[in-house]
């Protein structure tokens, strides 16, 4: 019986360990596009900290600092884009949520940015 328990423990999936940050991988927000659109927010963060942030409507550069499980986003001003009021509000909310992110974790292909509003992103498969 003890041998079976040891074998089971050895073959069971390990608890999710913090892996390496997925630099240079496109990450798509784990939400459906808004009605009438195919777009969802996308993050692409380089190992040098330079990032491209595509929100619901606007896009622009950012600087991202990653140290262990800590992360900090500094978004540059983004040019206005013609959008519906709903998308403009969603952009403002997403930018505010990214500015408040303090940590991250990865489980499989899901990267969770942790702050007052957790944000789940899926690694792109293309």
Named regions from a protein language model:
Residues 2-10:
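Bacterial N-terminal signal peptides
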Residues 9-126:
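Lipid interaction determinants
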């Amino acid at each position: 019986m003890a041998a079976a328990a040891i074998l089971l423990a050895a073959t069971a999936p390990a608890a999710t360990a913090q892996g390496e940050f997925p630099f240079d991988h496109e990450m798509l927000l784990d939400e459906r596009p808004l009605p009438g659109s195919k777009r969802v927010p996308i993050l692409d963060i380089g190992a040098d900290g330079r990032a491209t942030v595509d929100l619901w409507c606007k896009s622009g550069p950012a600087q991202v600092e990653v140290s262990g499980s800590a992360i900090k986003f500094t978004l540059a001003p983004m040019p206005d884009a013609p959008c519906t009021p709903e998308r403009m509000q969603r952009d403002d909310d997403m930018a505010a949520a990214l500015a408040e992110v303090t940590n991250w974790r990865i489980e499989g292909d899901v990267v969770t940015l942790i702050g007052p509003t957790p944000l789940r992103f899926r690694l792109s498969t293309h």
